[in-house]
Amino acid sequence: MVAQNNQQNKDETKGIKSYYCSKIEELEIKVNEKAQDLRRLEAQRNELNNRVRMLKEELQLLTNPGSHVAEVVKLMGKNKVLVKVNPEGKFVVDIDPTVDIAKLTPSTRAALKHESYTLHRILPNKIDPLVSLMKVEKIPDSTYDMVGGLDKQIKEIKEVIELPIKHPELFESLGIAQPKGVLLYGPPGTGKTLLARAVAHHTDCTFIRVSGSELVQKYIGEGSRMVRELFIMAREHAPSIIFMDEIDSIGSSRGESGSGGGDSEVQRTMLELLNQLDGFESTKNIKVLMCTNRIDILDPALLRPGRIDRKIEFPNPGDAGRLDILKIHSRKMNLTRGINLKKISDKMNGASGAELKAVCTEAGMYALRERRVHVSQEDFEMAVSKVMKKDSEQNMSINKLWK
């Protein structure tokens, strides 16, 4: 009887123990769930607090009065600076301790507090978007191997553009100033722009291309401002090459008397260009490359040494040059055997490089028209006759016009 009671007590104890163990496990699971919920809610609280803080900061910025934009004129001691605010005038203001005084150079844009006029921030230079678009992001893929018949011109442009950028110590050892600008002149289609792209490829520097007509603006002062911002951008991205194509559109000779407001604005743009050419040092790794077909109408002030240090002529190619250009442009063409490029070159006496390229393209068009995949000698001869023929309609007599 006693043994039976002991067994019954053991069973009851075991049952109670298992019951409490199961309850403890359930409570532990609930505690873990509550702890996870608590951590999630804490994370949400932190996120909301951060958002509230950001909104408060944004609200504070929105409620603060705006800053004045000023231009630094010069430093006036350790903690003072003379600035120019348009249209109010010039002021001597304090400098905030957080501002690096070494960066406060003349013509630097800065922000002044609305009430105290304390200089508290340095602003980036203001560049016209049209000027920023002149900067070529992708380096041109043209190389010197793609230029034919211009060995002398390549050598001269290497000496004044590529050599000072890559090896400035050579000029310092000789004690001579680096050339600033180069003028490429010659008939149309002789490879001036092509050689400029090749120079940009081999120097591996910032290439800024601008046409002279882009600097002729409608409103007074716009062209001069674009020229100033163009050179500012060139200084910021040095070493750089400024390539000005068709410079005769703004660099023509000045007459004794102005012939109109448009000509006066063009002359103001050219005067600003002359000022910028005189203003920057030749050691700043900024080279100016100008290109024109009409050197005879350029102003002598633009052509003088110190602004344009070298003038490189690009004549029409000679016999050997024409053959080299034909070989370059026909290098990737699918030609039949026995093509005599020398014979084709002899038929194009006086042709420019652009006309030689047009002959290769036109020969391919003749083969394409006849559904062939090879270009023959006859295709080249027909292309020469088409490209080099004279426009007889310009020399028609009056009798022929009235037939």
Swiss-Prot record:
Q: Name one GO molecular function term.
A: ATP binding
Q: Carries keyword Phosphoprotein?
A: no
GO cellular component annotations, sorted alphabetically? cytoplasm; nucleus; proteasome regulatory particle; proteasome regulatory particle, base subcomplex
Q: Which PROSITE patterns match?
A: AAA
Q: Which UniProt keywords apply?
A: ATP-binding, Cytoplasm, Nucleotide-binding, Nucleus, Proteasome
Tell me, which GO biological process terms does this entry list? proteasome-mediated ubiquitin-dependent protein catabolic process; proteolysis
Q: Where in the cell is it found?
A: Cytoplasm; Nucleus
Q: Which domain of life is it from?
A: Eukaryota
Record's Gene3D superfamilies? 1.10.8.60, Nucleic acid-binding proteins, P-loop containing nucleotide triphosphate hydrolases
InterPro entries per the UniProt record, alphabetical = 26S_Proteasome_ATPase, AAA+_ATPase, AAA_lid_3, ATPase_AAA_core, ATPase_AAA_CS, NA-bd_OB-fold, P-loop_NTPase, Prot_ATP_ID_OB_2nd
**Pfam families, alphabetized:** AAA, AAA_lid_3, Prot_ATP_ID_OB_C
Cite the binding residues for ATP: G186, P187, P188, G189, T190, G191, K192, T193
- Biological role stated in the UniProt entry: The 26S proteasome is involved in the ATP-dependent degradation of ubiquitinated proteins. The regulatory (or ATPase) complex confers ATP dependency and substrate specificity to the 26S complex.
What PANTHER family does the annotation carry?
26S PROTEASOME REGULATORY SUBUNIT
By sequence similarity, the record places it as follows: Belongs to the AAA ATPase family.
Instruction: Kindly provide the name given to this protein in its UniProt entry.
Output: 26S proteasome regulatory subunit 8
Provide the taxonomic classification: Eukaryota, Amoebozoa, Evosea, Eumycetozoa, Dictyostelia
